[in-house]
Amino acid sequence: LNTTTLNLNTGAPNLTFRGYKRKNGDVGVRNEIWIIPTVGCVNGIINQLAEGLRRETGGKGVDAIMAYPHNYGCSQLGDDHENTKKILRDMVLHPNAGAVLVVGLGCENNQPDVFREFLGDYDQERVKFMVTQKVGDEYEEGMELLRELYAKAIQDQREDIPLSELRVGLKCGGSDGFSGITANPLLGMFSDFLVAQGGTSVLTEVPEMFGAETILMNRCRTKELFEDTVKLINDFKEYFLSHGEPVGENPSPGNKAGGISTLEDKALGCTQKCGTSYVEGVLPYGERLKVKGLNLLSAPGNDLVAATALASCGCHMVLFTTGRGTPFGTYVPTMKISTNSTLAKNKPGWIDFNAGVIVENEPMEKTCERFIEYIIKVASGEFVNNEKKGYKEIATVSYTHLRAHETV
């Protein structure tokens, strides 16, 4: 990247990263093998299978071998069940996975055969199913399937991919008084740059937008998108109010200790993460991206739930700003950007990029140029801290106001 000629307002032509081109034309930034359960009853099995393949292969030739346990897939009904199915489907189809083994029990609500149909078109050489009640030794059967998948995945090679194919999620957590001054505006500048390149950014954690939602509404490309954004906000507000919960009591103890006093403070910082671009799409929870540019996604503020939702809509990585610090990660690279240099110094095993230099007289534009360079490195294979440490988890919503059958 030649930063001397970089124009952050219009983008720079022909920027690329080294990614994986999938059979269906989609692009990934990782080539991993995932083991995904249809139901929580088989969590122990999938963990053993992942460990078995790592031990047998040493993980050579792929970026990671991961099991993703969860607690759902049974004892769920209606929208709650549909939301779980959608997130699991999105994972199976995610381009950061070079191969996926779906493991079911057999008697669960999330029936493996029904879930297979729910996937739609998928690469049957890269996605395999095992129903544990129908096989004798589930470990040996699972290992045989994983060996087949591994043999396919290790053939994949990185190639030059236009930056216009990159999709990033925008998230904050453990925010402080510097969030709206350093890291969040930095993400906004990067988001505008990526959109100018033809790429995609996605903003979520809807309850964090309360108090600054009109900023987003005024930037909707069409009347329909404006109406979708109004519904996105109001659905969450109505959910809180219907349960007698005060909408304004969002800031956490950590937020307040860090200098954020009101929900409006927090919301103004939250919305800065998406820059000044027009809103081009509004997505229901569990739905996948359909248009490039800036999108809004229906998901709560909970860090792991929201980050999982961002990955599931198709984001290749999550850019996560924090003033207090957090180690977590979801199933795509979860990059931590500190709002202050003290955090970056004290937690180098958590923080990947320090935006605190912005209040130490480094121009925002220079910081953003370094940030772009770093993101291209990560998209091309450099691990962030949550990947190095194996902090990778998933979480889904367990309430039903995020209606699976409606578009917002």
Residue map of PLM features:
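A structural-propensity feature for long, helix-poor, extended segments
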Residues: 344-372
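Buried, small/hydrophobic-residue-enriched core segments of structured protein domains
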Residues: 2-267, 314, 324
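C-terminal transmembrane module of polytopic membrane proteins
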Residues: 367-383
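Active-site rim loops that border cofactor/substrate pockets in soluble metabolic enzymes
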Residues: 238, 245-260, 264-305
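A short C-terminal boundary segment appended to hydrolase-like catalytic domains
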Residues: 382-396
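Short acidic (Asp/Glu) and glycine-rich catalytic loops that position anionic groups and cofactors
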Residues: 125, 169-170, 209-216, 286-291, ...
